[in-house]
Amino acid sequence: MLAVGAMEGPRQSAFLLSSPPLAALHSMAEMKTPLYPAAYPPLPTGPPSSSSSSSSSSSPSPPLGSHNPGGLKPPAAGGLSSLGSPPQQLSAATPHGINDILSRPSMPVASGAALPSASPSGSSSSSSSSASATSASAAAAAAAAAAAAAASSPAGLLAGLPRFSSLSPPPPPPGLYFSPSAAAVAAVGRYPKPLAELPGRTPIFWPGVMQSPPWRDARLACTPHQGSILLDKDGKRKHTRPTFSGQQIFALEKTFEQTKYLAGPERARLAYSLGMTESQVKVWFQNRRTKWRKKHAAEMATAKKKQDSETERLKGTSENEEDDDDYNKPLDPNSDDEKITQLLKKHKSSGGSLLLHASEAEGSS
């Protein structure tokens, strides 16, 4: 039963000593009262002989004639004076013993408090029980101070935790998401292979952006960074018209022939396919519609003028045809007196000229 209890003691200390504050409190309790006080015989009041002290400190097993009712090894004199720590076999059973916790580098105060345990066996055997109690209380105070320092500082509590941030690559710069060229340069610097050759990785950018069509290079000529807003000689802001490539204008004209107005999604799709902004496509269509209206109005005016002139010409020919019909109709002297009178008045001048020519011809003859 005692052996089982001796094995359960390190297990309890292993669970209780998982955190530094609990370890310090448990060490204080163990320093004041040993784990199994009934198993150890009382120490003699007088100083023991040098032979017995040397034999007890050097031999790992108790002597044959010693009085040990439980069959356990009595603690060494140095173990009692070293901060009231448990025996060596109990602390060696688990890596979470009090000596291991106090000797950790993250708690310098506790490691300094464990220095009295390194005292030689001769001096520890000559000390009395009152001296061991005084050293135990001092060690308890040092352990409590170390626990308070560890609990107050977050670095002491988190010192033993692994840092997984060192495994991940550094975060990308902000310009990586706004400039494809900068993203490509950053990708070459961060990774040994290009992004397209990495297995199982989807491309970061759209394929149309990474491998652009021929007219996408003209985006550089349309960007406002090239000076859509310049300064005049007087220092005033001067707006310049952006220039488009022939392929862009050809695609815009073909789209304009199909439809004169674009909806929002159609404008966005056309702008992306041509490497232009939506505002540029919108302004181009507005200007193109204005030009088309002017041209259409001019064509309509020309067609109207041509139609009017043709109507007048047709009207004149119809009147002449009516006159010819009147002349070609036969006359009835009994019923067409009014018609004969109108024809004579209309052609009086022409008839007079004919009579004049006839009289001149007769006189010359």
Curated annotation (Swiss-Prot):
Modified sites of kind Asymmetric dimethylarginine: R190
Domain of life: Eukaryota
Record bears the keyword Iron-sulfur: no
A Pfam family matched in the record: Homeodomain
Tissues where the protein occurs: Expressed by neuronal progenitor cells in discrete domains of the ventral neural tube. In the pancreas, expressed exclusively in insulin-producing beta cells of the islets of Langerhans (at protein level).
GO terms, biological process: cellular response to cytokine stimulus; cellular response to peptide hormone stimulus; central nervous system neuron differentiation; endocrine pancreas development; negative regulation of oligodendrocyte differentiation; neuron differentiation; oligodendrocyte differentiation; pancreatic A cell differentiation
Subcellular location: Nucleus
Keyword Nucleus set for record: yes
Extent of Low complexity compositional bias: 48-92, 110-136
Gene3D superfamilies xref list: Homeodomain-like (1.10.10.60)
A Gene Ontology molecular function term of the record: RNA polymerase II cis-regulatory region sequence-specific DNA binding
Repressor domain: annotated span: 102-269
Function comment: Transcription factor which binds to specific A/T-rich DNA sequences in the promoter regions of a number of genes. Required for the development of insulin-producing beta cells in the islets of Langerhans at the secondary transition. Involved in transcriptional regulation of the insulin gene. Together with NKX2-2 and IRX3, restricts the generation of motor neurons to the appropriate region of the neural tube. Belongs to the class II proteins of neuronal progenitor factors, which are induced by SHH signals.
Description of its domains: The C-terminal domain contributes to sequence-specific DNA-binding.
PANTHER family according to UniProt: HOMEOBOX PROTEIN NKX, HOMEOBOX PROTEIN NKX-6.1
Name of the protein in its database record: Homeobox protein Nkx-6.1
Taxonomic path: Eukaryota, Metazoa, Chordata, Craniata, Vertebrata
